[in-house]
Design a protein with these regions (language model features):
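N-terminal first-folded block
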Residues: 2-48
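Charged phosphate-binding loop/patch that engages nucleotide di/tri-phosphates or the phosphate backbone
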Residues: 95-118
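Hydrophobic/aromatic beta-strand patches that form the interior of the parallel beta-sheet core
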Residues: 25, 51, 73-75, 105
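Acidic, metal-binding active-site segment of PIN/NYN-like and related structure-specific nucleases
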Residues: 43-63
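Histidine- and aromatic-rich ligand-binding microenvironments
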Residues: 31-45, 54, 73, 77-86
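Mid-chain, well-packed structural core segment of small domains
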Residues: 58-92
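Short glycine-/acidic-enriched loop or helix-start segments at secondary-structure transitions
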Residues: 14-15, 36, 60-63, 84, ...
């Protein structure tokens, strides 16, 4: 699974995913400060699952009909430490990672929502 992490994602989350064996491309390392539209284009170019903490991607996907071919995972873990966020995200990927592609998913404390077929 190709994963593209938006720069809104804490570096600790990216590192934890990498430590767990996931190949993660990180916008902050590649092309910092690009627009959300360009991030979505980059994800589509490589059919990557886009991981973001930016709710604007929900608007791009649902209101404007701009799809991410690999799917989107929105991380809503406000107020938690970066270490705890990393643990929650890796646990979610271990349990539900196979369900994330081609869906719009939200990871929040104690809950994972997966909206099929975006």
């Amino acid at each position: 699974m190709n994963i593209l992490a938006d720069e809104s994602i804490d570096r600790q989350i990216v590192e934890r995913l990498r430590q767990d064996g996931y190949e993660v491309l990180y916008i902050a390392e590649m092309e910092p400060s690009i627009t959300d539209e360009v991030v979505l284009e980059r994800a589509n170019e490589i059919s990557a699952l886009l991981v973001t903490a930016d709710k604007d991607f929900g608007e791009l996907v649902f209101r404007e009909g701009r799809l991410s071919t690999g799917g989107v995972v929105l991380i809503r873990l406000i107020g938690l430490s970066s270490t705890r966020k990393g643990e929650i995200v890796v646990d979610a990927f271990r349990k539900h990672g196979a369900d994330f592609p081609n869906c719009f998913s939200v990871i929040s404390p104690g809950r994972i929502r997966i909206r099929r077929k975006i």
